[in-house]
């Protein structure tokens, strides 16, 4: 039934059509009409007031990653809108469905350098899948509906809708509609490519499977697990592919690439077939393109044809939705057996275990303890740096949408906002953000968001008083010249958190951490744990920049090299 509504009412009606129940944002002058309507309909759509618009964009991203639904954030014109840019770029790089709604000055004020006027459509063009500016009330509803459809279809991504203030107040006829059904973009998967892939898989003696974030975005975890059993192959993943395949499964060998396990890096280098599923072959994964998987033929399965042969030359590509492609392959492939190869991989895992210093508090030790105390069931978000790699290496993820991190853009300050979004979307899960002390400083104000909105996230600060990952590179490749990476100062994170209304404790031993973490979970309140570790702790293994992944080295290898050089 048609009814006369103003633009702000239409925005809310369109959000409800799409099943939106939570919005993250920060108000301002240009968007006041929409916020007035949010107030009137607060029983239908919950608005989380963040401490900064960037926090809102990360929260929408975290909500989307944790739930599989579209995350929604809002901001006013000018600096409010530009503060969303880093979060939109983060979502864009990782193909996360987010819809950002911003308001702009009235149509008559556009192009006149008006107060808080900005061409946010132009600004966000490189970091959104699509964007709009709505200057006509008659186009508002269709634009918002289309934005949601674009964000979710094909290769997912963020979409921005900028609405002039006069449109939010204007009135027109509105008729509610059912949301459009999202169909895979590539409905016809090429038979020739499928046949080639099947022939290559059935001819392989030493196949390896590489899983990326596209498997999660396609909700293809079940099909992936069936496929791996069907072809009897070892499995590695990218940072974005965590949880698609269970971390406790014997076939799983860990992450591939710069900080991947030696087993994955050496195993892929010795394979005769690499099946890359839903991954874009980031430089952090392949290392040296010329030597990457040089013995192997490569099959790439991806929804986006632009990713084929972009970084790594492949032999066969199947373009299509990962879930749809694997469903076909699982139906048509015969059962494979690779006992000798699988045993070789198990021997490799025994030869190259992941180790760390257990006599003191350390990043890996913290992650393993969190895994133990949460029984592997928590949602883990991270910032970016050493702690991010430790969280990827030492928490054994059993399901998709359990590990939320900024993979492509590498955004420091992402994790706390993402944790807030994830907890809003999955209130029954324990949500833990793993942060470094450098990252915590970026968006620490979102602790106030958690306390104000009573969102019980746990913030674990892995505090080594340095910018750990940058310092690691300075130590290994820049002659130990530690330029601007030392953070020894008088900032007290515990007092900061307490000042914002959260509970907090500082811990210096694993025993102290265990007791404090249990208390944090039991409190069901925002809680910060300041965990003091050694400044010299490093992420191992490591591949030197530009090096071959087969040359991954660890601390022992480095010591042997130093001893040989000193002879």
Where is each model-derived feature located?
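N-terminal alpha/beta PP-like core and its mobile active-site loop of ThDP/TPP-dependent enzymes
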Residues: 1-333, 369, 373-376, 456-459, ...
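Thiamine diphosphate
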Residues: 116, 452-545
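A short acidic, glycine-rich active-site loop
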Residues: 48, 183-187, 406-409, 479-488, ...
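Catalytic phosphate/nucleotide-handling subdomain of diverse soluble enzymes
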Residues: 414, 418-456, 462
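Active-site nucleophile and cofactor-binding loops and adjacent substrate-binding regions
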Residues: 26-28, 47-58, 73-80, 135-136, ...
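Active-site diphosphate/adenylate-binding microenvironment
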Residues: 8-12, 16-21, 29, 34-39, ...
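Phosphate/pyrophosphate-binding active-site segments
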Residues: 138, 199, 295-386, 510-511, ...
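Hydrophobic, well-ordered secondary-structure elements that form the walls
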Residues: 298, 370, 382, 421, ...
């Amino acid at each position: 039934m048609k009814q006369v509504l103003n633009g702000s009412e239409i925005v809310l009606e369109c959000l409800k059509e799409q099943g939106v129940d939570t919005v993250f944002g920060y108000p301002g002058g240009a968007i006041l009409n929409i916020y007035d309507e949010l107030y009137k309909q607060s029983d239908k759509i919950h608005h989380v007031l963040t401490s900064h618009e960037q926090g809102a964009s990360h929260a929408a991203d975290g909500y989307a990653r944790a739930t599989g639904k579209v995350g929604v954030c809002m901001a006013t014109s000018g600096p409010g809108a530009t503060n969303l840019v880093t979060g939109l770029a983060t979502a864009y790089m990782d193909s996360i469905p987010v819809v950002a709604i911003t308001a702009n000055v009235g149509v008559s004020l556009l192009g006149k350098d008006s107060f808080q006027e900005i061409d946010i459509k132009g600004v966000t063009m490189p970091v959104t899948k699509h964007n709009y500016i709505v200057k006509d009330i008659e186009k508002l509803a269709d634009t918002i509906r289309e934005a949601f459809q674009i964000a979710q279809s094909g290769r997912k991504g963020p979409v921005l809708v900028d609405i002039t203030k006069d449109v939010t107040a204007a009135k027109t006829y509105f008729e509610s509609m059912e949301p459009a059904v999202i169909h895979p973009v590539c409905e016809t998967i090429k038979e020739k490519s499928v046949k080639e892939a099947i022939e290559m898989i059935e001819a392989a003696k030493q196949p390896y499977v590489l899983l990326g974030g596209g498997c999660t975005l396609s909700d293809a975890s079940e099909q992936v697990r069936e496929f791996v059993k069907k072809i009897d192959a070892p499995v590695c993943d990218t940072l974005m592919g965590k949880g698609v395949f269970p971390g406790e499964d014997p076939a799983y060998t860990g992450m591939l690439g710069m900080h991947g396990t030696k087993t994955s890096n050496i195993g892929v280098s010795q394979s005769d077939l690499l099946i890359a599923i839903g991954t874009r072959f980031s430089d952090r994964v392949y290392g040296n393109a010329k030597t990457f998987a040089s013995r192997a033929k490569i099959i790439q399965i991806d929804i986006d044809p632009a990713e084929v042969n972009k970084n790594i030359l492949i032999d066969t590509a199947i373009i299509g939705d990962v879930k749809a492609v694997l469903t076909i392959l699982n139906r048509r492939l015969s059962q494979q057996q690779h006992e000798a190869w699988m045993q070789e991989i198990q021997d490799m895992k025994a030869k190259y275990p992941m180790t760390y210093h257990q006599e003191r508090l350390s990043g890996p030790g913290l992650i393993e303890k969190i895994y133990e105390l949460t029984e592997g069931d928590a949602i883990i978000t991270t910032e970016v740096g050493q702690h991010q790699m430790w969280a990827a290496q030492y928490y054994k993820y059993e399901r998709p949408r359990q590990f939320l991190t900024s993979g492509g853009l590498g955004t420091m300050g992402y994790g706390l906002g993402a944790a807030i979004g994830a907890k809003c979307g999955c209130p029954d899960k324990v949500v833990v953000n793993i942060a470094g002390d450098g990252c915590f400083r970026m968006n620490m104000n979102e602790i106030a968001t958690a306390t104000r909105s009573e969102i019980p996230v746990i913030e674990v600060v892995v505090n080594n008083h340095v910018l750990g990952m940058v310092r690691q590179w300075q130590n290994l490749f820049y002659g130990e010249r530690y330029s601007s990476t030392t953070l020894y100062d008088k900032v007290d994170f515990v007092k900061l958190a307490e000042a914002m209304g959260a509970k907090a404790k500082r811990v210096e031993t694993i025993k102290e951490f265990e007791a404090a973490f249990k208390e944090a979970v039991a409190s069901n309140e925002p809680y910060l744990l300041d965990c003091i570790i050694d400044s010299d702790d490093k992420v191992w293994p490591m591949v030197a920049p530009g090096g071959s992944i087969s040359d991954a080295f660890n601390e022992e290898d480095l010591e042997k090299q130093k001893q040989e050089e000193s002879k």
